[in-house]
Swiss-Prot record:
It comes from the Bacteria. Residues 320-322 are annotated as: G5. Residues 208-212 are annotated as: G2. One of the essential components for the initiation of protein synthesis. Protects formylmethionyl-tRNA from spontaneous hydrolysis and promotes its binding to the 30S ribosomal subunits. Also involved in the hydrolysis of GTP during the formation of the 70S ribosomal complex. GO terms for cellular component: cytosol. Residues 183-190 are annotated as: G1. One of its GO terms (molecular function) is GTP binding. Signal peptide: none annotated. This is Translation initiation factor IF-2. Residues 283-286 are annotated as: G4. It is found in: Cytoplasm.
Length: 674
C-alpha cells in the first residue's frame, strides 16, 4: 500500500476528510491538514482499524430499533394587535383560540379573566406566546419610516427562514458548492470558466471585461459545482462584492507572469470580509516569463496568504486556463474544501435565493438571475424580493433550457416579476399570491411616494443651487441595463472629481430611456447617459424638441472617456506663463511728464508689449508688472529680439535701478485636465 494524503485515504474509507482528521487526532497521529502524507505502514493499520469499526457499527445498527423522529419545535407566528384588540374576547378571535380555553388555562395559572375584560400589552403578549404567537403592536403609518417598514418585513421573513432551518437541522443535507472566480482584469478568469465549461465565453465579452455576472453549473466526477464569474475591472467593485456574499468558496486567479495587482487585493478583501475560504489559482504558467515561486512570494508579501506547501493553510494550484493544465486538480481541491466546510441546506422547505443580477429583458420582461440557497424553486411559486413580488412563470437554467424545478445551488433565471427586483434583497418563497402582495404592495407604494417626494425636493434644491452658486454643475440622468451595471457607472462617474464642477445624478434607473427621463433632464437642464440600453422613439422625439442630449454607450471605457472630455470642456482655462526672454537694465532715463524709462539690453529671447515683466535685484525677486510702452530707438514697436536694445516703461512706475535683471513672460490659456 503506497503512502497517501489524508483526503485520499478518506475517499478509500468512504468517510469525510473532516471526520478522518478528527479520528486521526484522537488516535494521536500527528497530521497537520488534509494535504498531509501518511506512510505505507500507518495506512495499512488504519485501514484494518476502520474496517473493524465499520463492521461493529453495522451489527449494532441492525440490532438497535430505529428511533422515532423528535417532535419539531413550534414556530412562533407573528400577530399584529391594534388598541381595540386589547380585550380578551377580541384577542381570542385574533389568535384563533377558543375564549373558554384561554379563560380556563389562565385560571389554572392563578389569573382570573372575564370575556370582555380589558388587558394590557404585556398580558396580551404573554397570552399570545402561550399559544404560539409573537404579538406585535400596530403603529400608525406616519410613525413608521418606509425603510424601517421594509427592514422589519424582510427581517421577519429572514427570521422565519432561520427558525425553519434551525428547527429542521437534522434534515439538512449537503448541497453543491457555489464558487466565485475573482481576480484582476485579463488574468484569465473568464478563460478559466470557458475551459471548465468547454464553451466559448471569452470571445463574447465586450470591451475586454465581463459586464454582467453569470452563473454556471458543471459536474466533476459526479459532483456538481456552481461557478459565478465576476468582472475584473476596478469599476465593478460592487458586483464583485455581491459575488463574494453569494458564494461558498472563492477561486482567486493570479497570473504567474503579472503577479498580485490592485484588483487582486480588492477581490481578496471581499472574500475575507465575507469570511469565505480562498483557493488561489496561479494561472498562465505556460507563459515563458511565468514565475510561480515569485507569485507565491507576492501572495505572502501583499496579501499575507501563506501557501500550503510553504507551511500555510491556503491551497494554491498552478494552472493554465489556455491548455487546461491543472484544472482537474483545481476542481478536486474545490470539492475537498466544500467537503471540509460541510455546506448544507434545507432542501424540503420553501425556496430562498440570492440575486446575482436583475434586468429588464426586452422579450421576457423583468428577470432575475439567482442562485437557489435553500429549498426547491418551482414554476408557479410566489416570491417576495423586497418591495417586489413574482409568480414564477418560467425558470431558465444556465444552458438556456426551460425547467420546472431548481434545486439548491442551481443558477437560474426567474421570469415573472412585476418589476425589476433590486439586487440588494434576497428572494423568499411565500405560500400564496395574496401573501406576496400583502408583504410587497404597501412597501412598493411607500417606496414610490418617498422616491417622488425626494426627487421633487432634490430637483428644487439643485435648481436653486445653480442660480445661487458660481460653481458649475453637470446634471445627469443615468440609465443602465442592469442594477450591477448602473452601480458600476455611478461609481465611475463619482471618480471624476473636480473642485470647479459638481456632478449631480438627478435620477438613475434600470431599463430603456423613456419620456419621463427626458422631461426630468429638461427640468434640471441636464443630459441623459445610457449604458447598454435603448432609447424609445417617443423619448428621442421629445429630446429633439427639448434640446436634450442623450448619449448611449456599450463599453464602460468609452463612457468614462467622453464624460471626462465633457467635464474638462466645462473647466475654466488655466493661465500658464512661458519664459520667452531675459534682459538687463543698463541705464534709467527720468523724463518729465512721462516717468522712468529703462534702457534694456536683451540677453536672450525676445520681449513683446504683451509680456509680463519680473524684476530681480542681486538675484532676489522684487515684483512683476505689465509693459506700458515698448520702443526700439524712438519707434513704438510690438516686439524686440536679442541682442538688440530697447526702451520700456512699466505701468506701475516702481523703482527701477541700473543692473536690475528682467525676465519676460508670455501668458497662454491652457485647457485644464481632470
Amino acid at each position: 500500500m503506497p503512502r497517501l494524503r489524508v483526503y485520499e485515504l478518506a475517499k478509500k474509507l468512504n468517510m469525510s476528510t473532516k471526520d478522518l482528521l478528527q479520528e486521526l487526532e484522537e488516535l494521536g497521529l500527528n497530521v497537520k491538514n488534509h494535504m498531509s502524507y501518511i506512510d505505507e505502514e500507518t495506512v495499512g493499520l488504519l485501514l484494518e482499524i476502520f474496517e473493524e469499526e465499520e463492521e461493529t457499527a453495522a451489527k449494532a445498527k441492525a440490532a438497535k430499533p430505529k428511533k422515532e423522529k423528535e417532535e419539531l419545535e413550534e414556530i412562533f407566528q407573528e400577530v399584529v394587535l391594534k388598541p381595540e384588540d386589547l380585550q380578551l374576547n377580541t384577542l381570542a378571535v385574533k389568535i384563533g383560540v377558543p375564549l373558554n380555553r384561554i379563560i380556563q388555562d389562565m385560571f389554572v395559572k392563578g389569573i382570573v379573566l372575564k370575556p370582555t375584560q380589558q388587558i394590557d400589552e404585556k398580558t396580551a403578549k404573554d397570552i399570545a406566546k402561550i399559544y404560539g404567537y409573537r404579538a406585535k403592536f400596530y403603529q400608525p403609518e406616519e410613525e413608521i419610516s418606509e425603510l424601517e417598514t421594509i427592514e422589519n418585513e424582510l427581517e421577519r421573513l429572514e427570521k422565519y427562514f432561520e427558525t425553519l432551518y434551525e428547527t429542521h437541522k437534522d434534515e439538512l443535507s449537503i448541497r453543491p458548492p457555489v464558487v466565485t472566480v475573482m481576480g484582476h482584469v485579463d488574468h484569465g478568469k473568464t478563460t478559466l470558466l470557458d475551459k471548465i465549461r468547454r464553451t466559448r465565453v471569452a470571445e463574447k465579452e465586450v470591451g475586454g471585461i465581463t459586464q454582467s455576472i453569470g452563473a454556471y453549473q458543471v459536474v466533476h466526477k459526479g459532483k456538481k459545482i456552481t461557478f459565478i464569474d465576476t468582472p475584473g475591472h476596478e469599476l465593478f467593485t460592487e458586483m464583485r462584492a455581491k459575488g463574494a456574499q453569494a458564494t461558498d468558496i472563492v477561486v482567486l486567479v493570479v497570473a504567474a507572469d503579472d503577479g498580485v495587482m490592485p484588483q487582486t487585493i480588492e477581490a481578496y478583501n471581499h472574500a475575507k470580509v465575507a469570511n469565505v475560504p480562498v483557493i488561489v489559482a496561479i494561472n498562465k504558467i505556460d507563459k515563458p516569463n511565468a514565475n510561480i515561486e515569485a507569485t507565491k512570494r507576492q501572495l505572502v508579501d501583499k496579501l499575507n496568504i501563506i501557501p500550503e506547501d510553504w507551511g500555510g493553510d491556503t491551497i494554491t494550484v498552478p494552472i493554465s486556463a489556455r491548455t487546461g493544465h491543472g484544472i482537474d486538480e483545481l476542481l478536486e481541491m474545490i470539492l475537498l474544501v466544500a467537503e471540509l466546510r460541510e455546506i448544507k441546506c434545507y432542501p424540503k422547505g420553501p425556496a430562498r435565493c440570492v440575486i446575482i443580477e436583475s434586468k429588464l429583458d426586452r422579450s421576457l420582461g423583468p428577470v432575475a438571475n439567482v442562485i437557489v440557497k435553500d429549498g426547491e424553486l418551482r414554476v408557479g411559486d410566489y416570491l417576495v424580493a423586497g418591495p417586489t413580488y413574482c409568480k414564477v412563470r418560467i425558470l431558465i437554467d444556465d444552458k438556456g433550457k426551460s425547467i420546472k424545478i431548481a434545486e439548491p445551488s442551481q443558477p437560474v433565471m426567474i421570469v415573472g416579476f412585476e418589476e425589476v427586483p433590486d439586487i440588494r434583497y434576497s428572494i423568499y418563497a411565500v405560500e400564496s399570491l395574496e401573501s406576496a402582495r400583502t408583504v410587497t404592495q404597501q412597501l412598493k407604494e411607500r417606496l414610490e411616494r418617498d422616491k417622488m417626494a425626494k426627487r421633487r425636493v432634490r430637483l428644487e434644491e439643485l435648481l436653486k443651487m445653480m442660480e445661487e452658486s458660481e460653481k458649475k454643475e453637470l446634471n445627469l440622468v443615468l440609465k443602465a441595463d442592469t442594477f450591477g451595471s448602473l452601480s458600476a457607472v455611478q461609481n465611475a462617474i463619482a471618480s471624476l472629481k473636480s473642485e470647479e464642477i459638481k456632478i449631480n445624478i438627478v435620477h438613475s434607473g434600470v431599463g430603456t430611456v423613456n419620456n419621463s427621463d427626458v422631461m426630468l433632464a429638461s427640468a434640471s437642464n441636464g443630459i441623459i447617459v445610457g449604458f447598454r440600453v435603448k432609447v424609445d422613439a417617443q423619448a428621442r422625439k421629445t429630446a429633439e424638441n427639448e434640446g436634450i442630449q442623450i448619449k448611449t454607450y456599450e463599453i464602460i471605457y468609452d463612457l468614462l472617456d467622453n464624460m471626462k472630455l465633457a467635464l474638462e470642456g466645462m473647466l475654466k482655462p488655466e493661465t500658464v506663463e512661458e519664459l520667452v526672454g531675459r534682459g538687463e537694465i543698463r541705464k534709467i532715463f527720468d523724463i518729465k511728464k512721462v516717468g522712468k524709462i529703462a534702457g534694456v539690453q536683451l540677453l536672450e529671447g525676445h520681449v513683446s508689449k504683451d509680456c509680463i515683466v519680473k524684476v530681480y535685484r542681486n538675484g532676489t525677486f522684487l515684483f512683476s508688472d505689465q509693459i506700458d510702452s515698448l520702443k526700439h530707438y524712438k519707434e513704438d514697436v510690438d516686439k524686440v529680439s536679442a541682442p538688440q536694445e530697447c526702451g520700456l516703461k512699466l505701468k506701475s512706475n516702481e523703482d527701477l535701478r541700473e543692473n536690475d535683471e528682467l525676465e519676460f513672460y508670455e501668458q497662454h490659456q491652457v485647457q485644464k485636465k481632470l
